[in-house]
């Protein structure tokens, strides 16, 4: 007679399910091969414009020398050598900061400034596209508030850090890669905007299924599998 202990041991060695390997990101260009119609609809969506680079058509902010004075900071928006810049004058002096990305599409477009140690920071003055209640132009996101450097709410602080606070929702396949010992970010992403796999998940397994010969599908004529 087989003991209950032996049966338990045998059952523990039998896999209850077959787990597939985790999927990898393939990028939307691979998705377009079969889903061009969906891609055309996506291309006009806010997801497609969640992050914009300078020079893109939908990045409509004007860098024509306009200024905003708020919270003890004077901000001037202008072009230098063909690139958008923000001249910041505050209690620490004056500095010029290049714009790395535009963040969002409407009713406002915020700007991201590249800072040391791999950080991207959201600047507290945004561009209103004029599609909401506010007229078109630059405006302070925190009017009347003066936040000193070192405060987490300052634009260089942790609460305005793109890597930690924003990236996972505005880009696809984000890995923050924060090194606490060195206090640096080595953030990477698969695609800069909210692309197909941000919502549907990594697509390599789906692609493998889609290109698999139909005779390999369950229920197919087994004679064709010889």
Question: Where do the model's predicted regions map?
Answer:
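Extended surface/linker regions that mediate inter-domain or inter-protein docking
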Residues: 75-226
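Bacterial N-terminal signal peptides
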Residues: 3-14
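Generic structural "secondary-structure junction" signal
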Residues: 27, 53, 65, 127, ...
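Boundary at the C-terminal end of the N-terminal hydrophobic targeting segment
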Residues: 11, 18-23
């Amino acid at each position: 007679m087989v003991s209950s202990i032996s049966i338990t041991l045998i059952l523990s060695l039998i896999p209850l399910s077959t787990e597939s390997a985790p999927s990898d990101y393939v990028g939307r260009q691979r998705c377009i091969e079969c889903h061009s119609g969906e891609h055309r609809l996506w291309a006009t969506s806010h997801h497609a414009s969640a992050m914009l680079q300078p020079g893109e058509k939908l990045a409509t902010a004007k860098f024509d020398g306009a200024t905003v004075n708020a919270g003890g900071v004077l901000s001037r928006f202008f072009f230098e050598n063909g690139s958008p810049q923000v001249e910041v004058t505050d209690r620490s002096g004056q500095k010029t900061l290049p714009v790395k990305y535009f963040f969002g599409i409407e009713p406002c477009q915020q700007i991201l400034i590249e800072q040391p140690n791999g950080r991207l920071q959201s600047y507290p003055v945004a561009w209103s596209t004029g599609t909401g209640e506010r007229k078109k132009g630059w405006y302070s996101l925190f009017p009347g508030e003066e936040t000193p450097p070192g405060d987490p709410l300052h634009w260089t602080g942790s609460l305005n850090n793109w890597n930690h606070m924003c990236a996972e929702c505005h880009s696809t396949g984000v890995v923050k890669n924060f090194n606490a010992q060195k206090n640096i970010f080595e953030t990477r992403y698969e695609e800069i905007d909210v692309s197909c796999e941000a919502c549907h998940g990594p697509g390599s397994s789906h692609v493998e299924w889609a290109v698999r010969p139909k005779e390999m599908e369950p229920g197919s004529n087994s004679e064709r599998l010889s």
